[in-house]
Swiss-Prot record:
Cellular compartment(s): Cell inner membrane
Biological role stated in the UniProt entry: Could be involved in insertion of integral membrane proteins into the membrane.
Official protein name in the record: Putative membrane protein insertion efficiency factor
PANTHER family: MEMBRANE PROTEIN INSERTION EFFICIENCY FACTOR-RELATED
Membrane topology reported for the UniProt record: Peripheral membrane protein
UniProt family annotation: Belongs to the UPF0161 family.
Alphabetized Pfam families for the sequence: YidD (PF01809)
Keywords, in A-Z order: Cell inner membrane, Cell membrane, Membrane
Naturally occurring in which organism (per UniProt): Nostoc sp. (strain PCC 7120 / SAG 25.82 / UTEX 2576)
InterPro entries cross-referenced by the UniProt entry: Membr_insert_effic_factor_YidD
């Protein structure tokens, strides 16, 4: 299942993305981020991370360097405040 989603993203990069000017505000690009997140975390968690990233890719966000977190790193921006 993971390979199907990666294949679809690569198809987008090859056939659809070249039709439009580059507009991604992040490095790595959102499509590369999606591929890496799915490879590292699987379809559901990696896909969710990719969707959140794409939703941040707009003119009002500064963008910049935003790599896929390593396994074990805090990746989903949950509140990790002290509970005590």
């Amino acid at each position: 299942m993971k390979q199907i989603f990666i294949w679809l993203i690569k198809g987008y990069r090859m056939f659809i993305s070249p039709l439009y000017p580059p507009t991604c505000r992040f490095r790595p690009t959102c499509s590369m981020y999606a591929i890496e997140a799915i490879e590292r975390f699987g379809v559901f968690r990696g896909g969710w991370m990719a969707i959140r990233r794409i939703l941040r890719c707009h003119p009002f966000h500064p963008g910049g360097y935003d790599p896929v977190p390593e396994l074990g790193e805090h990746c989903c921006h949950h509140d990790s405040g002290n509970k005590g």
